[in-house]
């Protein structure tokens, strides 16, 4: 029977491997990362990744779920918060801001999230269809449901949704070296993300008011 100390050490090792895997996948993508590199980054024996997770594929899916698995549900539920014009605008702003959290990182977990998102979008893995279904579609539908409150025509609704999606996705598609080119010199990343969010939302609100 395992002692409490052994169980505790096992959990710590598992978490260290997950943290190392997140950094490795965010930096190198699925194909570029290796279990050996992940174990080296975690400072543990090279065999432990297989012991705790089985395969690199299983580890990648778990890391992706940790980053993106909890994102879709709250965004999909935003439409349920809307009771009037003010709450609709607040919900749309929350959606845009949360999406930019993934694609325009400032530090820490945001950078890892954005790195993984970038690699998966620009170099899709064999899990891409699964991720798109489980993580991407709920996020997209969350935006679409909000816009459907203002746009009745299906073609126009899809145009609005895909247009906003494209604006917030561009940072995921661009290499991080290009991010500075989009941002005025001297403006911090988080401040710029807030300005981008304001710009997109203000444009949407103004155009909706004219419609």
Report each predicted region and the residues it spans.
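Hydrophobic/aromatic-rich alpha-helical bundle segments in the mid-to-C-terminal region
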Residues: 114, 128-137, 146-200
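Short secondary-structure transition hinges
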Residues: 73-82, 101-141, 185-191
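N-terminal intrinsically disordered/low-complexity leader segments
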Residues: 1-12
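An amphipathic alpha-helix adjacent to DNA-recognition modules
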Residues: 11-19, 52-76, 80, 129-133
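Helix-turn-helix
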Residues: 16, 24-58, 62-66
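N-terminal hydrophobic signal/anchor transmembrane helix of membrane proteins
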Residues: 88-105, 193-211
């Amino acid at each position: 029977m395992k002692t409490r100390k052994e169980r505790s050490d096992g959990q710590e090792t598992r978490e260290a491997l997950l943290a190392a895997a997140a950094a490795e996948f965010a930096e190198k993508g699925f194909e570029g990362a290796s279990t050996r590199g992940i174990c080296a980054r975690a400072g543990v024996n090279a065999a432990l990744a297989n012991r705790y997770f089985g395969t690199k594929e299983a580890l990648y899916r778990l890391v992706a779920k940790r980053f993106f698995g909890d994102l879709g549900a709250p965004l999909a539920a935003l439409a349920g918060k809307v009771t009037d014009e003010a709450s609709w605008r607040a919900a749309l702003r929350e959606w845009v801001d949360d999406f930019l959290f993934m694609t325009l990182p400032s530090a820490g977990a945001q950078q890892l999230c954005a790195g993984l998102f970038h690699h998966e979008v620009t170099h899709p893995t064999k899990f891409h269809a699964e991720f798109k279904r489980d993580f991407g579609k709920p996020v997209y539908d969350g935006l679409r449901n909000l816009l459907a409150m203002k746009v009745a025509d299906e073609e126009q609704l899809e145009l609005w949704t895909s247009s906003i999606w494209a604006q917030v996705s561009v940072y995921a598609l661009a290499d991080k070296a290009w991010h500075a080119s989009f941002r005025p010199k001297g403006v911090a990343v988080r401040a710029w993300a807030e300005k981008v969010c304001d710009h997109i939302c203000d444009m949407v609100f103004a155009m909706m008011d004219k419609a």
